[in-house]
């Protein structure tokens, strides 16, 4: 049997397709999501429906975004889904999640088993509509999850760490071995929950998110340089020091809170 053939579908490398097949892992994920029938839940990249089908059993409706036309057609024709499935056959990077939230008149819950090549750009895309999202559950490569959870002064800590931790509380749920998927990937995966902060309870309020984007981009684009050099076009050494940051530090030595303080100093 061809290792990339599963349930009559050839996994497409360009879409990063690895299908979740372990029933125990699937049950754990569904339990952690804990869906309610009336909620608006969106699954990104449902594939062959490993999560879609058990979720549909508990939902009045389920929205899915699937780029692969063959998989989209299979889901549309599935008898268990025909009365509940709302399918968007398109690139998730073109989806306006605020518009979807307005259409269904409530905040969104989002989940997905994300391929490595889209995980970072997709997270930044979702941040644009974060105010319309209740929570997110994602299966990611363990390396990416380590970056989301990383603390300052570590190798894994980078711009992604700062921006995710600014927007959300990051909660690891479970690690998933390669043999839980078909075809079997070469890496471990992990499931995480992202809980967006609300403005009134945000630990690091920023007046303009574009300023935080600018500061972190400048710092981490030249992460081996000192802040004196990487942020010299934005701040004087005195301004850095007044924020409690030594100009001789590098990007990975600065906490999320300190980046937010710097963003709020920009005019």
From Swiss-Prot:
GO cellular component: cytosol
E.C. no: 2.1.1.182
Residues that hold S-adenosyl-L-methionine according to the record: 18, 20, 45, 66, 91, 113
CDD domains, per database record: AdoMet_MTases
Domain of life from the UniProt record: Bacteria
Signal peptide segment: none
Pfam families (UniProt xref): RrnaAD
Positions of disulphide bridges: none
Subcellular location: Cytoplasm
Keywords noted in UniProt: Cytoplasm, Methyltransferase, RNA-binding, rRNA processing, S-adenosyl-L-methionine, Transferase
InterPro entries xrefs: KsgA/Erm (IPR001737), rRNA_Ade_diMease-like_C (IPR023165), rRNA_Ade_Mease_Trfase_CS (IPR020596), rRNA_Ade_methylase_Trfase_N (IPR020598), rRNA_adenine_dimethylase (IPR011530), SAM-dependent_MTases_sf (IPR029063)
UniProt-listed SUPFAM superfamilies: S-adenosyl-L-methionine-dependent methyltransferases
One MF term in the entry's GO annotations: RNA binding
Main location: cytoplasm
Record field: catalytic activity: adenosine(1518)/adenosine(1519) in 16S rRNA + 4 S-adenosyl-L-methionine = N(6)-dimethyladenosine(1518)/N(6)-dimethyladenosine(1519) in 16S rRNA + 4 S-adenosyl-L-homocysteine + 4 H(+)
HAMAP family documented for this protein: 16SrRNA_methyltr_A
UniProt function note: Specifically dimethylates two adjacent adenosines (A1518 and A1519) in the loop of a conserved hairpin near the 3'-end of 16S rRNA in the 30S particle. May play a critical role in biogenesis of 30S subunits.
Sequence similarity: Belongs to the class I-like SAM-binding methyltransferase superfamily. rRNA adenine N(6)-methyltransferase family. RsmA subfamily.
Name of the protein described by the UniProt record: Ribosomal RNA small subunit methyltransferase A
Organism: Hamiltonella defensa subsp. Acyrthosiphon pisum (strain 5AT)
The gene coding this protein: rsmA
């Amino acid at each position: 049997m061809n290792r990339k053939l599963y349930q009559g579908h050839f996994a497409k490398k360009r879409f990063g397709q690895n299908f979740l097949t372990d029933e125990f892992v699937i049950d754990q994920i569904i339990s952690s999501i804990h869906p309610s029938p009336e909620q608006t839940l969106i699954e990104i990249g449902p594939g062959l429906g490993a999560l879609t089908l058990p979720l549909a059993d508990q939902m009045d409706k389920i929205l899915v975004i699937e780029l692969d036309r063959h998989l989209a057609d299979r889901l549309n024709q599935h008898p268990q889904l025909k009365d509940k499935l709302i399918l968007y056959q398109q690139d998730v990077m073109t989806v306006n999640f605020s518009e979807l939230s307005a259409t269904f008149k409530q905040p969104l819950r989002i989940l997905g088993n994300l391929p490595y090549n889209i995980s970072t750009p997709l997270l930044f895309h979702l941040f644009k509509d974060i105010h319309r999202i209740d929570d997110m559950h994602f299966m990611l490569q363990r390396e990416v999850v380590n970056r989301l959870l990383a603390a300052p002064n570590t190798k894994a800590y980078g711009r992604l760490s700062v921006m995710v931790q600014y927007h959300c509380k990051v909660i690891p749920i479970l690690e998933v071995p390669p043999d839980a998927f078909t075809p079997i990937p070469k890496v471990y995966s992990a499931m995480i929950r992202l809980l967006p902060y609300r403005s009134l309870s945000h630990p690091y309020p920023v007046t303009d998110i574009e300023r935080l984007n600018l500061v972190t981009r400048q710092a981490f684009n030249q992460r081996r340089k000192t802040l004196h050099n990487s942020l010299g076009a934005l701040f004087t050494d005195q301004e850095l020091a007044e924020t409690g940051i030594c100009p001789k530090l590098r990007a990975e030595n600065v906490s999320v809170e300190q980046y937010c303080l710097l963003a709020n100093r920009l005019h």
